[in-house]
Amino acid sequence: MARIAGVNIPTNKRVNIALQYIHGIGPKFAREIVTKVGIADDRRVNQLSDAEVLQIREAIDADYQVEGDLRREVSMNIKRLMDLGCYRGLRHRRSLPVRGQRTHTNARTRKGPAKAIAGKKK
């Protein structure tokens, strides 16, 4: 298994598919990286030389924010919104949907399991 950005990449998959196992790299960035390094689309990770793996690793380190750094930045952005006290920050703090979804009947994923209310029967 090749190790790129602290993640073990599966060896039997195509390179652009295997790169998507790294947090922060999706289909678009994976294609960009593969074309920038100059690797054919149908090559598999186990067919790559150590030099090509090193080129991929350097391209990712130079141009993309992935794994821990990306997670840290996202959590810092959410924390900043919460510290500002803006509407989006309040919604994050209260564990409610942030982007305007309805909460009267839905949003169970964000709010958690339904809490029973004493004396409330139909």
Curated annotation (Swiss-Prot):
> What UniProt keywords apply to this chain's record, in alphabetical order?
Ribonucleoprotein, Ribosomal protein, RNA-binding, rRNA-binding, tRNA-binding
Q: Could you give a GO molecular-function term held by this entry?
A: structural constituent of ribosome
Q: Which HAMAP family match?
A: Ribosomal_uS13 (MF_01315)
Note down the stretches annotated as region Disordered.
97-122
The record's listing under Pfam families reads: Ribosomal_S13 (PF00416)
Protein source organism: Brucella canis (strain ATCC 23365 / NCTC 10854 / RM-666)
PANTHER family hit by this protein = 30S RIBOSOMAL PROTEIN S13/40S RIBOSOMAL PROTEIN S18, SMALL RIBOSOMAL SUBUNIT PROTEIN US13M
Which Gene Ontology cellular component annotation is one that this UniProt entry carries? small ribosomal subunit
What is the designated name of this protein?
A: Small ribosomal subunit protein uS13
Per the record, the similarity remark reads: Belongs to the universal ribosomal protein uS13 family.
Q: Which GO terms describe its biological process?
A: translation
Question: What role does this protein play?
Answer: Located at the top of the head of the 30S subunit, it contacts several helices of the 16S rRNA. In the 70S ribosome it contacts the 23S rRNA (bridge B1a) and protein L5 of the 50S subunit (bridge B1b), connecting the 2 subunits; these bridges are implicated in subunit movement. Contacts the tRNAs in the A and P-sites.
Spell out the InterPro entries in the cross-references: Rbsml_uS13_C (IPR027437), Ribosomal_uS13 (IPR001892), Ribosomal_uS13-like_H2TH (IPR010979), Ribosomal_uS13_bac-type (IPR019980), Ribosomal_uS13_CS (IPR018269)
